[in-house]
Structure formats: C-alpha cells, structure tokens
C-alpha cells in the first residue's frame, strides 16, 4: 500500500506538504497542538483504551471538541495499522462513518484525530457504563440499525475501491449527540479490487462476531461484515452479548439462543427487557429476522448490505414476505439441532494487536 511506505519513509515535512495538497477536509496536526488540546494526554481526558493504545478527549483553540487516538507503542505492525486507518478514513465520506479531522506523525508518535462523539459507543449503552440509564429507546435502536447498515453499505457498494471493515461490532458503532450511528475503527480494513470476490488474509477481529469462513480459513469478503452486522443487530434487539455465559462452564452464541425463539415466533422473549415492552412489534420481528439471515453460516445465503438496508426499512412487502418464509425460520422436527453460528469461543480478541474493554473505545478501539 502506497500510504504505508509513505509514512514509514521520508521526512515528516515532506509528508505534510503532500497530504495538505490532497485534502481540504482534514489536516496534519502538530504534536504540540494535540498535547495542548488534551492537557498533555492527561489521564482525566482519557475516554477509552484498547490494545492499540488510548483515546483522549480534547478541545482545540477554536473550541471544537475532538477525540485523539494515540498509538501505545510504535512498531512496524502499529505503523501499518495507523497508515491503513488514516488512508481509509481519508477516503470515505458518509454521515454514518466516523469522519477524520486529521493526523499527527512526529518521531514515533502516531495520532489520529476525529470528531468527538458525546454518546460514546453502542456497547457502552447495551452492556457498559451507560446501560443502566436506558437511553436507547426503540426508535433510537431502529435508527442506529439503519444508519450503521447504510454506512457499511457505502463501504461495500459505493467506495472506490470497495472496503471490507473486518471488525464490525457494537464497540465500533459510535453515537453522536443525536444518537445517530457512526461506524468507526478502520485499522483492520481491507481495500478490495473490483475483480476480486474475497481476499485471504490473517484473521483479526473479535470472536463472537467472526464469520465461520473467515475464522477458519481467513477468507475475508463483504459477506463477513454482513455476518458481523447480524450479530450487532441481535445485540440491539435483545440487549444480550454476542456470546452469553449462562453458567461458568457454558458459552452460548447469541444466534443459537435467538434462532429457536424466532422459529417459534417468540419475538417478545428476544426483546431487551430494558425496553419494558415499549417497541414496535413488526420492527422488532424484522430486526431479528434480518439479524439471523445475516448471521447464517453459509456466506452465499447472506444478503448484501444494500439488501439489509432495504429489509430494515421495510419498504418492500414482497422482500419481507420472502424473509419471513425463508427455510431457516421453519420449525425443526423435535430432536434435530442446526448450528448456524461460528465457532464457539470467548469474546476476547484473537489478535495480539487488539484488546478492548466493554466500555473502551469511544472513538473506535
């Protein structure tokens, strides 16, 4: 990738001059400027932490608020991830994708500057420090589902070249002041040539969200993002984690819990108890069915993200009817069990480069 060698080689001043010519929407920050904005990366300014390092809240001289993602340790791998994220953030412009404000690359400091989103991540509202406040009513959940789907659809169908995110999960869906979704964290993203159906690569991401073909064989495609998004939808609908632990020795993927209930049309039992019954039944049903059709094990049977957007909006009665009558939702004969989820496992990162806490990553960990 051209950008990677661009960051790793050459003088900093040369890099700045070239990048300033290529962008009018973001800029190169000086380390001194970001130190001032974050009170010298003060602990009290820290709003998230992960394997990459830390995220800090900051305020620029003009009063605008920013989130600064600071790499913890410089290394060739970290440099590559930094370069990939800056390049992709610089390429994409969509209301449901996190916007790049700029970057800093001085000495061994690598920092990414983005908009500060005051409502943090989706995971913080479902499972983290904001979950007790119950700020996600049903209308907000539907808006988050559709908005994040539209952001991912942009990556798959409108970006040039196409982009596979490879790390879609609840902690990478951030929420602005109006609870509008912004998909974040492009450090693991891949650019896909027009003539390619997939890329074979080292597996990275989070167990519980990984598509089976990617987890087992390293085959990454847009369909892998669709699978991961299906898991996020189930979390949105149910308030449960991607992998639940009903007992200390049992780990249950959310798909294996939800699918039998969906087949029996027991959607009320899937709904998040924190909603207290305040949801639109038809929309809940739609979200759950879309989630499960996305997260089935066979990639060729998953919808595209454009189809997911259409289904979530419920604009085509014919498509909704086809969804409800899909064979995967037919009740199974007694004694027959069909596992549609990926391999069982913990929700810990499988890559040494990524390690997120439930309430970490308010800019994208």
Predicted stretch roles:
Residues 102-103:
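A short, aromatic-enriched beta-strand patch in the conserved N-lobe beta-sheet
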Residues 150-163:
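Protein kinase catalytic-loop region centered on the HRD/HxD motif
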Residues 1-24, 280-286, 290, 297-365:
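Intrinsically disordered, low-complexity cytosolic regulatory tails
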Residues 217-222:
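Activation segment
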